[in-house]
Amino acid sequence: MFEKLEELAKDNKKISDFHIRAGSPLAYRQTGEIVKVQEVVVTAQDLKDLLSMNCNEHELNKFEKTHELDTSVSLSGLRFRANFYKTINGPACVC
């Protein structure tokens, strides 16, 4: 999932948001439309890894307690605002 996310972020300037949800295909908003990457299904572990790679212990504790977190995500030198939240199907993120 991370490789595809990095590839899309680097190569396409028209993407405004990534929608990352456990159990669903990786999705992004491009010129107002949601596009799903069917070959990349996001796992709960993918999102946990994304959180742990980008958050300190205080932020992780806050996420566990409140089920949401506004932070930032860095991938290959690119930085994004991110909102992590929990759904009935597991963690999710919009960045």
Name what the model sees in each region.
Residues 1-95:
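N-terminal "pre-motor" subdomain/linker immediately upstream of P-loop NTPase catalytic cores
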